[in-house]
């Protein structure tokens, strides 16, 4: 049972992990006050009335905000945010952020989002502080229980429906705040204590959502009348839907471990809950829509198969485009959808518009720079791709190692005279990568580790730098860019020409320690181009060459399992579904300890989910 209503759970300056340590040493009588169940308590709050305008709240005012006003102003702040009025949204919520649970949730969410986007340590600290305040505010509204009531709850689940409406909303807000604080805990520092603290927050949030879902079912069964039931329902749908969806994406071996400690994830159920939430009229309905959009336009591509439900994405986005035609976030999703359809020119135009419509949050610009860089890579407009990679290196702190590697990789695709015109030193850039890697939750980012390993070729023990073969196209493959390029025959044909030129150049070079690895990389990329051009027999020959060279590879051992993944898709496209599944399972079960292993396992999990049973995803 989730910790619901315990003041011990959140004191002024303590978090879940510290509370857990305190709980270990408490006596049984003290434990009874922890309230591990929803229990019947008679205390009901007096109505909080909005005594003054939130924007003009006098210092020290004792005026209170009722649930209705909190929901309305939080919804208004969301509209301001989607209209690029980020500061206005914060200023609307700030005066009541320590009095109203929804003002606290909305205000801290915007501060946290800013922290995640900037990756500045000061912003991260501000986000943690804001979220700690928000948790304290939500705690004020949660169920309070006496020792007797808590003891009785150990014998029975109690009457869930006897929570007041305000207390139910407090649980949802508290769970949302916990999740966001966990995310910041992971990026704050790399020590194990923070990792454990973040994990405990996520588990507590998950348990609260499960309990809120039980409350929702009780209310629906008993047909209880509540003024803001649809808002509570929207919060439950958003939380449980997102949890189910995200957990279902994890590789099978991780899911088995999480199920052992009480987690479970069902993709179809998660999408259903989010769709139900999106179709409602609650404040969180837009957030349910945006979560599904993120799944279709990003997650399905990077951690999935690349098979995207563009039709649903367009349908969900349409009302937002009408209401917020110049909203940065909405334009960004619009551009992503156009890109996934293969409309690279339209996507470019929309990303540029996304940049031009606001200057308040430069972080949205960085997202667009990233996308524009990839579009130019797809088109092999290397100087333009270099321009955006350089902007990212200078302005964004998200992943310096990745940005610098990509900048060097793009430059290495250019003729030497054009590189000289940029006054950049490609070898020097590659050598910088190792010193720029970072750690989150105590772990290096997989894409940064990959970039560091590839860049080592330029810093060999002998002191004589080697040279990577088509590193920009290799990174494009890693980010599943061939799925996007596959929508355009002209782009696929142009890429095939480039790959075949590299193949010919390799054949004319002296044999080195890297020759087999480079040859297999070229064969993998060539096979992907041929697969996109619907030339399956030639593609299969390329893929088989990589698999047959497995024992000869010295460095890039990731090539074989990733090639098996591509081979499985080739078989599936030819109707050989059983053969495809068998190859996927071989890739999953027979290989380990290679670069980007987790990313491939995510993709295999997504493919098996789609292929083993009918799906409406």
Swiss-Prot record:
Pfam families: Iml2-TPR_39, TPR_6. InterPro entries: Iml2/TPR_39, TPR-like_helical_dom_sf, TPR_rpt. The keyword Cytoplasm does not apply. Disruption phenotype: Chow-fed deficient mice display increased HDL-cholesterol level, accompanied by increased ABCA1 and MYLIP expression, increased oxysterols receptors LXR (NR1H3 and NR1H2) protein level without change in NR1H2/3 mRNA levels. Many NR1H2/3 targets are up-regulated, including ABCG5/8, SCD1, ELOVL5, INSIG2 and LPCAT3. Deficiency of TTC39B reduced processing of SREBP1 a pivotal regulator of lipogenesis. GO terms for biological process: cholesterol homeostasis; lipid metabolic process; negative regulation of cholesterol storage; regulation of cholesterol efflux; regulation of cholesterol metabolic process. Regulates high density lipoprotein (HDL) cholesterol metabolism by promoting the ubiquitination and degradation of the oxysterols receptors LXR (NR1H2 and NR1H3). TPR repeats lie at residues 328-361, 520-553, 561-594. Keywords: Lipid metabolism, Repeat, TPR repeat, Ubl conjugation pathway. The keyword Nucleotidyltransferase does not apply. It comes from the Eukaryota. High expression in lung and spleen. Low lower expression in liver and small intestine. Weak expression in heart, brain, kidney, adipose, and adrenal gland. This is Tetratricopeptide repeat protein 39B. PANTHER family: TETRATRICOPEPTIDE REPEAT PROTEIN 39 FAMILY MEMBER (PTHR31859), TETRATRICOPEPTIDE REPEAT PROTEIN 39B (PTHR31859:SF4). Belongs to the TTC39 family.
């Amino acid at each position: 049972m989730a910790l619901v209503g315990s003041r011990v759970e959140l004191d002024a300056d303590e978090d879940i992990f510290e509370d857990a340590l305190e709980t270990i040493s408490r006596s049984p009588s003290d434990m009874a006050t922890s309230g591990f169940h929803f229990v019947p308590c008679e205390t009901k709050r007096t109505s909080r009335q909005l005594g003054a305008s939130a924007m003009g709240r006098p210092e020290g005012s004792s005026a209170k905000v009722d649930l209705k006003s909190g929901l309305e102003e939080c919804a208004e702040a969301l509209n301001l945010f989607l209209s690029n009025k980020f500061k206005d949204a914060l200023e609307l919520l700030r005066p009541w952020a320590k009095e109203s649970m929804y003002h606290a949730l909305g205000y801290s969410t915007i501060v946290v989002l800013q922290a995640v986007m900037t990756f500045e340590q000061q912003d991260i600290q501000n986000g943690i502080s804001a979220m700690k305040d928000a948790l304290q505010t939500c705690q004020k509204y949660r169920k309070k229980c006496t020792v007797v009531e808590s003891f009785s709850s150990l014998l029975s689940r109690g009457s869930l429906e006897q929570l007041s409406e305000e207390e139910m909303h407090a649980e949802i807000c508290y769970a949302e705040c916990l999740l966001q604080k966990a995310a910041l805990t992971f990026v704050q520092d790399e020590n194990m204590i923070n990792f454990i603290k973040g994990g405990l927050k996520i588990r507590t949030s998950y348990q609260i959502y499960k309990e809120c879902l039980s409350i929702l079912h009780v209310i629906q069964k008993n047909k209880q009348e509540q003024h803001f039931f649809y808002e509570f329902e929207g919060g439950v749908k958003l939380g449980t839907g997102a949890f189910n969806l995200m957990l279902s994406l994890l590789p099978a071996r991780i899911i088995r471990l999480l199920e052992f400690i009480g987690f479970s994830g069902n993709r179809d159920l998660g999408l259903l809950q989010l769709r139900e939430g999106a179709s409602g009229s609650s404040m969180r309905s837009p957030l349910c829509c945006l979560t599904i959009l993120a799944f279709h336009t990003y997650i399905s591509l990077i951690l999935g198969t690349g098979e995207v439900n563009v039709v649903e994405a367009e349908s969900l986005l349409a009302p937002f485009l009408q209401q917020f035609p110049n909203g940065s976030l909405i334009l960004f999703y619009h551009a992503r959808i156009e890109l996934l359809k293969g409309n690279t020119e339209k996507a470019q135009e929309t990303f540029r518009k996304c940049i031009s419509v606001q200057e308040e949050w430069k972080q949205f610009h960085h997202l667009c720079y990233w996308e524009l860089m990839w579009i130019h890579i797809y088109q092999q407009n290397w100087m333009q791709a270099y321009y955006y990679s350089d902007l990212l290196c200078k302005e964004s702190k998200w992943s310096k190692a990745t940005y610098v590697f990509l900048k060097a990789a793009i430059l290495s695709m250019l003729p030497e005279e054009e590189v000289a015109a940029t006054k950049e030193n490609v070898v020097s850039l590659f050598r910088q990568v190792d010193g720029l890697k970072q750690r989150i939750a105590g772990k290096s980012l997989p894409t940064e580790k990959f970039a560091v390993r590839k860049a080592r070729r330029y810093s060999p023990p002998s002191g004589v730098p080697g040279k990577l073969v088509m590193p920009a196209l290799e990174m494009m493959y890693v980010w599943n860019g061939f799925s996007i390029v596959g929508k355009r025959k002209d782009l696929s044909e142009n890429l095939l020409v480039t790959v075949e030129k590299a193949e010919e150049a390799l054949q004319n070079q002296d044999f080195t320690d890297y020759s087999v690895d480079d040859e297999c990389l070229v064969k993998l990329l060539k096979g992907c181009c041929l697969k996109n051009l619907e030339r399956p027999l030639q593609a299969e020959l390329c893929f088989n060459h990589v698999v047959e060279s497995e024992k000869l590879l010295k460095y890039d051992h990731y090539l074989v399992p990733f090639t098996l993944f591509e081979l499985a898709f080739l078989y599936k496209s030819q109707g050989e579904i059983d053969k495809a599944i068998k190859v996927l399972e071989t890739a999953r079960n027979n290989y380990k300890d290679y670069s980007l292993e987790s990313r491939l396992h995510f993709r295999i999990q997504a493919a098996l989910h789609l292929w083993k049973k009918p799906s409406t995803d």
